[in-house]
């Protein structure tokens, strides 16, 4: 080995010397053609981990392109021999197929091989070549290409050019290419024309001379006094639907005000500047104060804003916790309130949507108490099902809502491509697919080099940073540094100043491409974009269409590419691309009758304005009188007051999006420069990112963590140029620790339990991983655990059932995990929730499939467990507990009715799975549910063990199929507390509205997992 390294260094030194001589000769203009013998051609053979190959061969996908294996990914000698033999056989088979084909066609096989190899033969450095362009010339040419939108080729030409790339292997799946034709603009006139000066201001600031049909219809409806919801495509000019009515209302009444609510601060800032520009160009309103009022507003500025502001930009959280509780300070504003804007309506669903719906009812109630019945609500949304119905549920009104869904805005033709990374070896699919990071980099570079301004959406922050670094490195390697300088990342976590700078650079065309998370999914205007690449199937179909709408914002042709990950849900869509274009998410749901949510908001409302049940029942429903009697104090006039404690602030104790998290500050402590803050990161992320030795990426720059001060919530990083990233070695245990309630299910000895649940996350080390996902080193670290408390429901799976499943060659953990997914996906049938409102314990592939070669001492109880998102105050799991019998029955019906073989998003797989559905068995899930419902677990016609339906049968001995499980033991009750078994009632077994069930698309996806909290006490039981 030492001799090899010595010779290699000599070769490199000789090569560099020849390069220097050649450069000097070229500079003098007398460069002779050097002899070929003056060069040494170096080869490097980089093989994949054999254990990774074996994992893929067994039907499971390695998690997030990780290589499994020991220190460095080595494999036993026997595995290496088998791999070599298999590859020899593949090569021999390919040669024989070539010879047979040539014999039939009359071609010369040797000539074909030589011709095909020509493109792969390294070129001698001394071969004649064109003079290279200077870096300055390259920058100037590329800048000119970006500055002229018409200079780039058409999207059809760009796609055609893919076929000339050496890495092209027909990655667009069969049936995955679609063309959505261009749409011409449709205009309409307002029933009452705009004032001439306002029309001129609109032309000057927005370059709008005529209104589209949907804009005119919405403005006319608002002028008639109706509430309006506009559900049209991205970049269809929806903001004018509320900007113009606000201007008209402010001019009409000197005391009129408007309230604009946005789910994110970035979106609020974007629309704030747009409205300010319009009003500033309209002389009658040029002095109107338009401002934000949120958590960043300085305390000393708030009094003046409340007194003088006429248009307030805020968010639902600020309205709930700061504005409504100070009703007396906002009376001027509420009396004059004429327009309320609720942008991005599709965001408000599940528990968060239920909270916001009650906040809006409280707002309507305060305005009515002040004699203001002239408030009109206008909402904009991406395309959703039943927009009028959903807005009515949010506002608590049954009539007077106009829904506008016909889009009159123009758009260019849009090309869609469903793209699957190619197999590493077409003759040996067991080796898996090419890295999607590398595939995304190739596609992204192909686009931006041609002046196609591109945004690549990654599902998580870390992926965005890794892909950005790979794209930049690949561009520099191609000698295209001028392009690499114009590719940036955008995600939450960056400072406000950095994000505003990136937005402005993108808007003004100074950036060629951007790698982003869903932080750019909502409608912040970043200018013209030509292409969208989605790396991995988004968490919801609505998100997919929202991201796709980012392309083609300036009426030119555009491209959308859905690049599938190797995980089961993504591969389901790769194999069924028609579902990408035809499926839709289920209707959005809110539940203002949720006991805990309603109780909390009734307390808030009583503190704002005393409650008169006979009047306020229209806002809070028929349960209001009983709630007032139980929670509030009645005065002599029949009004109810909140008097729990002097100075109490119930709104402060009720976070709409879950409990506030502790944040860690990441500090750049690189020697030789002043310390600066990189990011502020929630604790549930920081525990997996910030430990000594961890590699952290920020804007594509690599940092290494040198110290973590948990008492100060601070982590220190220094810049380092390393060629690897780190992956934590961790585990998370979800344990039921205290039983509060027990219910019998109508099946003898099967029970459902409800109580306190603890979630403990531990990081005990990390892997150093190179860009090919090979493990370079294994390091141990000590970090404190992250412990969170919540409440949940669980059903124990008897050990006899576990043994029965293993006897049929199915991994028992895979069966239980798949059954949990099947039940979890159905919870919206009984309670208004999105999938992350209720969660489950997901199984890790390496641990579960390690078998006897990776024994574990950390046994997990054999049970189905579901729990509320930590920090949530709605107790969704309490309703899951109530309807557990129906959920088990419907889940079994869905699995048995699904036509897939190994599981799909329609039955046992979900995008919300934190382990990418690596541990899953459809047949096992069916057996678990049948057993809990006291039905025969297996049929005689079940497929034999070697068929595809038994994807986990390869594991061999029965112990290997249960080695991570133990018999679930009873969970104790609270000290000195006796819990009686509740009998199930007829209402609890009633099936939900099956029309809603029928509308649930087969591949039901779920939203991006939100952050957890550090420690949260269990929510109280309903009164």
How would you label these PLM feature ranges?
Residues 63, 81, 85-98, 102-213:
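Helicase-associated low-complexity/disordered flanking segments
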Residues 295-336:
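Conserved helix/coil segment N-terminal to the catalytic DExD/H
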Residues 546-587:
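Conserved segment of the helicase C-terminal RecA-like domain
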């Amino acid at each position: 080995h030492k001799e090899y390294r010595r010779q290699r260094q000599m070769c490199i030194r000789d090569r560099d010397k020849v390069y220097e001589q050649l450069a000097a000769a070229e500079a003098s203009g007398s460069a002779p053609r050097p002899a070929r013998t003056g060069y040494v051609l170096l080869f490097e053979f980089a093989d994949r981990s054999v254990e990774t190959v074996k994992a893929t061969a067994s039907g499971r996908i390695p998690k997030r392109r990780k290589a499994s294996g020991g220190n460095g990914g080595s494999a036993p000698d026997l595995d290496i021999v088998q791999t070599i033999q298999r590859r020899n056989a593949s090569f021999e088979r390919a040669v024989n197929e070539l010879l047979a084909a040539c014999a039939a066609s009359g071609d010369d096989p040797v000539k074909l091989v030589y011709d095909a190899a020509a493109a792969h033969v390294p070129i001698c450095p001394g071969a004649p070549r064109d003079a290279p362009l200077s870096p300055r010339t390259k920058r100037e040419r590329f800048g000119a290409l970006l500055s002229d939108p018409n200079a780039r080729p058409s999207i059809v030409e760009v796609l055609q050019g893919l076929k000339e790339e050496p890495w092209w292997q027909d990655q667009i799946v069969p049936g995955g290419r679609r063309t959505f034709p261009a749409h011409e603009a449709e205009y309409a006139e307002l029933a009452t024309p705009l004032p001439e000066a306002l029309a001129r201001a609109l032309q000057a600031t927005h370059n709008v001379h005529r209104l589209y049909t949907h804009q005119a219809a919405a403005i006319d409806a608002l002028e008639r006094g109706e509430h309006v919801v506009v559900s049209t495509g991205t970049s269809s000019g929806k903001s004018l639907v509320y900007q113009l009515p606000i201007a008209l209302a402010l001019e009409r009444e000197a005391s009129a005000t408007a309230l604009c609510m946005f789910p994110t601060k970035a979106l609020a800032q974007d629309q704030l500047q747009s409205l300010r520009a319009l009003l500033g160009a309209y002389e009658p309103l040029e002095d109107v104060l338009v401002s934000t009022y949120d958590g960043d507003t300085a305390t000393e500025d708030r009094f003046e804003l409340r007194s003088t502001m006429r248009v307030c930009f805020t968010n639902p959280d600020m309205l709930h916790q700061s504005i409504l509780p100070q009703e007396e300070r906002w009376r001027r504003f509420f009396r004059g309130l004429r327009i309320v804007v609720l942008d991005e309506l599709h965001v408000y669903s599940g528990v968060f949507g239920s909270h916001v719906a009650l906040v809006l009812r409280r707002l309507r109630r305060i305005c009515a108490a002040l004699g203001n019945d002239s408030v009109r609500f206008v909402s904009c949304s991406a395309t959703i099902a039943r927009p009028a119905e959903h807005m009515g549920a949010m506002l608590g009104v049954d009539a007077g809502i106009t829904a506008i869904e016909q889009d009159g805005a123009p758009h260019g033709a849009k090309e869609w491509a469903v793209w699957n990374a190619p197999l590493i070896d077409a003759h040996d699919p067991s080796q898996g697919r090419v890295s999607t990071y590398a595939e995304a980099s190739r596609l992204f570079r192909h686009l931006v080099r041609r002046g196609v301004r591109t945004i690549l959406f990654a599902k998580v922050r870390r992926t965005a940073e890794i892909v950005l670094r790979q794209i930049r490195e690949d561009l520099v390697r191609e000698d295209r540094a001028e392009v690499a300088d114009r590719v940036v990342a955008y995600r939450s976590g960056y400072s406000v100043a950095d994000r505003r700078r990136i937005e402005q650079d993108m808007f003004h065309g100074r950036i060629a491409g951007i790698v982003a998370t869903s932080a750019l999914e909502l409608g912040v205007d970043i200018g013209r974009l030509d292409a969208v690449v989605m790396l991995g199937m988004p968490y919801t179909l609505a998100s997919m269409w929202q991201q796709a709408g980012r392309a083609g914002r300036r009426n030119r042709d555009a491209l959308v590419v859905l690049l599938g990950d190797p995980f089961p849900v993504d591969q389901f869509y790769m194999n069924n691309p028609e579902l990408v274009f035809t499926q839709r998410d289920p209707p959005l749901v809110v539940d203002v009758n949720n006991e805990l949510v309603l109780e909390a908001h009734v307390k808030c409302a009583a503190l704002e304005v005393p409650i008169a049940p006979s009047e306020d029942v229209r806002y809070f429903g028929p349960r209001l009188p009983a709630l007032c009697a139980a929670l509030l104090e009645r005065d002599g006039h029949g009004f109810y007051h909140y008097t729990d404690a002097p100075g109490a602030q119930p709104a402060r104790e009720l976070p709409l999006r879950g409990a506030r998290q502790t944040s860690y500050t990441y500090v750049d402590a690189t020697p030789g420069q002043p310390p600066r803050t990189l990011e502020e990161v929630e604790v549930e992320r920081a525990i997996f990112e910030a430990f000594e030795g961890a590699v952290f990426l920020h804007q594509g720059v690599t940092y290494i963590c040198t110290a973590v001060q948990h008492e100060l919530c601070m982590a220190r990083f220094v810049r380092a140029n390393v060629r690897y990233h780190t992956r934590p070695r961790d585990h998370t245990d979800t344990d039921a620790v205290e039983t509060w309630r027990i219910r019998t299910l109508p099946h003898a000895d099967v029970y459902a339990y409800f109580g306190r649940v603890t979630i403990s996350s531990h990081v005990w080390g990390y892997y150093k991983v190179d860009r090919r996902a090979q493990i370079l080193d294994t390091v141990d670290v000590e970090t404190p655990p992250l412990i969170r408390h919540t409440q949940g429901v669980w059903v124990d799976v008897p050990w006899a059932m576990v043994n029965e499943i293993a006897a049929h060659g199915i991994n028992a953990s895979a069966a239980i995990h798949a059954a949990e997914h099947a039940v979890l996906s159905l919870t919206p049938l009984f309670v208004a929730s999105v999938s992350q409102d209720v969660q489950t314990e997901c199984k890790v592939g390496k641990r579960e499939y390690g078998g006897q070669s990776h024994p574990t001492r950390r046994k997990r109880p054999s049970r189905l467990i579901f729990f509320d998102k930590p920090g949530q105050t709605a107790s969704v799991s309490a309703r899951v507990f109530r309807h557990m019998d129906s959920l088990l029955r419907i889940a079994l019906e869905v699995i048995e009715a699904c036509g897939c073989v190994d599981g799909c998003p329609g039955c046992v797989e979900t995008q919300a799975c934190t382990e990418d559905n690596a541990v899953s068995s459809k047949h096992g899930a069916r057996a678990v549910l049948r057993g809990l419902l006291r039905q025969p677990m297996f049929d005689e016609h079940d497929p034999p063990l070697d068929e595809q339906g038994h994807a986990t049968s390869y594991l061999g001995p029965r112990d290997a199929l249960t080695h991570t499980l133990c018999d679930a033991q009873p969970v104790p009750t609270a000290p000195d507390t006796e819990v009686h078994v509740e009998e199930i009632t007829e209402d609890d077994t009633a099936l939900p509205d099956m029309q809603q069930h029928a509308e649930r698309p087969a591949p039901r996806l779920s939203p991006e997992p939100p952050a957890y909290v550090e420690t949260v006490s269990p929510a109280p039981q309903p009164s």
